[in-house]
Amino acid sequence: MATPREDHLKKGATASVYHTLVAGSVSGAVARAVTAPLDTVKIRLQLSNKSLGAHDGLRQTVVRIFKNEGIRAFWKGNVPAEIMYILYGATQFTSYSMFSKALTELETTYGFNLRPSNHSLIVGTSAGLTSLIVTYPFDLLRTRLAANSERHFLSMTAVIKQVRASGGLAGLYMGAKPTLLSLGLNSGLMFWTYEIAREVSAQYKDNIPFIEGFCGFFAGASSKGITFPLDTLRKRMQMRSSKTSIIGLARTILRREGLFGFYKGFGISLIKTAPTSAVSLFVYEVVLNGM
C-alpha cells in the first residue's frame, strides 16, 4: 500500500522556514513559466474599453498581438512577473506556514479550536496580504509592460521612471486598494477551498494520481470567480497616472461597458488561474515531500 503523502498546508503541519521558502519560490517560478502568454492576453482584455463579445475579444486580441508584435510579445512583462511570482510564492507559503503555527499556538493557549477550513481561511488571507505588500510594485510593472502594444519592448527601468515622474515612489502602489481586497480574499478563499477539497477527496488519494493538482484546480477556479471584478479594477487603476477612486472607476465601467466590463478576460483568466493554482500547489507539495 502506498505511503500517504503529507499535506504541508494542513492545520498544525510543521515545515522549516527554509523548506517552505524554497518550495514556495520554485512553485511560483514554474507556475509563471507555464501561464505567461495567457496572462498577457488577459491583461490586454481587461484594459480594453471596447464592447466586444468574450469570444470575439479573445480571438481578436490573440491575433492582433501575434500579427503586430510577434510571438515574443506574449512574454512582455515576464521579467517583473517572474520576480513577482517567485517572491509571491515564497512569501505566501512561508508566511502561511508561520501564521498557521502561530494561530495553532493561540488555539492551544486560549483553549479554542477552529475547524480546519476556517483555520485555512484566516491564515490564507493573512498570507495573501503579506505577499501583496512585498510584491505589488512588480505586479504594477508587469501590467504596464504587458499593456505595451508597440513592437519594441519597454524596459523595467523606463517604466519605473515613468511611474516615479507621475506619482513618485507611491505610484508603484497605484491600485493597491482593490488589490488588498482581491488578493487577500482570493488567497484566503483558495486555501480554504483547497483544504475542503482535500478533506472530501481524502478517501481517494491512494487511487487517484495528482490529487493535489485536482484540488488546486478547484480552489483556483472558485476563488477567481468571486474576486475577478476587483482584479479588473486593479488593472485599470495601475495604468492611470493620477489617483482614481474605486467607486468612481467602477461606475464608469458599469456605465460605459455594462456588467460584462468587469469580467473581460475572465474566461482566459479561469484557464490561466486554475492551472496556476494547481501547478503551484502541486509543485509546492512535491518539492517539500522531496526535501
From Swiss-Prot:
GO biological process, one term: transmembrane transport
SUPFAM superfamilies the UniProt entry points to: Mitochondrial carrier (SSF103506)
Keyword Cell membrane: no
Top-level taxon of origin: Eukaryota
Pfam family, any one: Mito_carr
Location in the cell: Mitochondrion inner membrane
Repeat positions for Solcar: 15-102, 115-200, 207-290
GO cellular component: mitochondrial inner membrane
Membrane topology recorded in Swiss-Prot or TrEMBL: Multi-pass membrane protein
Key words, A-Z: Membrane, Mitochondrion, Mitochondrion inner membrane, Repeat, Transmembrane, Transmembrane helix, Transport
Matches recorded under InterPro entries: Mit_carrier (IPR002067), Mitochondrial_sb/sol_carrier (IPR018108), Mt_carrier_dom_sf (IPR023395)
Assigned protein family: Belongs to the mitochondrial carrier (TC 2.A.29) family.
Entry protein name: Mitochondrial thiamine pyrophosphate carrier 1
